[in-house]
């Protein structure tokens, strides 16, 4: 899997400690809608990191603190290659773990856009519990606490949906 960053213990993006995996690409769809401001601009300039999915799963499962895995910015659902990398990671995780951990995908796409672009995505992942955070970053929007994620989301159009 190719990523931009990995935070092995993240306490910001979910109500429980998580492993945060920053995906490598984005089409910057939010920028035209928001005066060309990107919250992930600096991340997009970082080096690409190649890491074996099995090693990453082992690292996650050997950490007694983390309870979830987050795939996030840049854009996890940017292209089919990124989606396949996530599916591969989840497949390895599902076969290796003794208990179910939550997988979270932070996407800037709307729910309708995800359903149009990847109509079988939620079914194809075959992993529960799965949370998808939908919606774009809008600068100077009204933040709110999402009840599923248990954290503040920066834009009013953003929300999480739990698939069980």
Please identify what each model-predicted range represents.
Residues 41-58, 77-123, 131:
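Canonical radical SAM enzyme core domain
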Residues 4-52:
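Canonical Radical SAM [4Fe-4S] cluster-binding loop centered on the CxxxCxxC motif
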Residues 22, 72-74, 104-108, 135:
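A cross-family glycoside hydrolase active-site/sugar-binding cleft signature
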Residues 118-119, 126-164:
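Classical nucleotidyltransferase
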Residues 69-72, 81-82, 157:
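Flavin-dependent oxidoreductase catalytic cores
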Residues 18-20, 68-70, 102-104, 131:
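Structural preference for beta-strand elements that scaffold enzyme active sites
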Residues 55-77:
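Short Fe-S-cluster ligation motifs
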Residues 28, 76-78, 111-112, 136-142:
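Conserved radical SAM core fold
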């Amino acid at each position: 899997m190719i990523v931009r960053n990995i935070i092995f213990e993240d306490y910001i993006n979910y109500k429980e400690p998580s492993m945060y995996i920053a995906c490598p690409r984005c089409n910057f769809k939010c920028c035209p809608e928001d005066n060309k401001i990107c919250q992930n601009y600096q991340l997009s300039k970082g080096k690409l990191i190649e890491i074996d999915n099995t090693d990453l799963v082992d690292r996650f499962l050997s950490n007694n603190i983390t309870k979830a895995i987050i795939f996030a910015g840049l854009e996890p659902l940017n292209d089919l290659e990124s989606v396949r990398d996530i599916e591969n990671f989840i497949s390895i995780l599902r076969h290796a773990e003794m208990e179910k951990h939550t997988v979270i995908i932070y996407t800037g796409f709307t729910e309708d856009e995800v359903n149009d672009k990847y109509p079988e995505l939620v079914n194809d992942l075959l992993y529960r519990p799965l949370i998808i955070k939908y919606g774009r970053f809008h600068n100077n929007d009204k933040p709110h606490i999402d009840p599923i994620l248990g954290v503040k989301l920066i834009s009013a159009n953003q929300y999480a949906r739990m698939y069980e």
